[in-house]
UniProtKB/Swiss-Prot annotation:
Role, per record: Carrier of the growing fatty acid chain in fatty acid biosynthesis.
Name of this chain's protein: Acyl carrier protein
PROSITE patterns the UniProt entry points to: CARRIER, PHOSPHOPANTETHEINE
Entry keyword Cytoplasm: yes
Phylogenetic placement of the source organism: Bacteria, Bacillati, Chloroflexota, Chloroflexia, Chloroflexales
InterPro entries named among the record's database cross-references: ACP, ACP-like_sf, PP-bd_ACP, Ppantetheine_attach_site
Record PTM: 4'-phosphopantetheine is transferred from CoA to a specific serine of apo-ACP by AcpS. This modification is essential for activity because fatty acids are bound in thioester linkage to the sulfhydryl of the prosthetic group.
The organism of origin for this protein: Roseiflexus castenholzii (strain DSM 13941 / HLO8)
Transcription regulation found in the keyword field: no
Pathway noted in the entry: Lipid metabolism; fatty acid biosynthesis
């Protein structure tokens, strides 16, 4: 289960990158449908997540990250595997 610190940092990054209020960034929120991200927003957000958490997210994996929870789970999995 992702730590509260990881979740808080991810929410902060998403809020900054997408210009949305952190209160809207819930685990079930979908980046494109609920948070109005376009493809450029998603690329920039993924790059920021990679830098913040020290993980690499290949394009084929990034395409599967649909919700905030998907992002949390993916990053946690990458950190545990390292």
């Amino acid at each position: 289960m992702p730590s509260p610190e990881m979740e808080a940092r991810l929410k902060q990054i998403v809020a900054e990158q997408l210009g949305v209020d952190e209160s809207k960034i819930v685990p079930t929120a979908r980046f494109t449908e609920d948070l109005n991200a376009d493809s450029l927003d998603l690329v920039e957000m993924i790059m920021e997540l990679e830098e913040a958490f020290g993980v690499e997210i290949p394009d084929e994996d990034a395409e599967k990250i649909i919700t905030v929870q998907d992002a949390l789970n993916y990053i946690e999995q990458k950190l545990q595997a390292a």
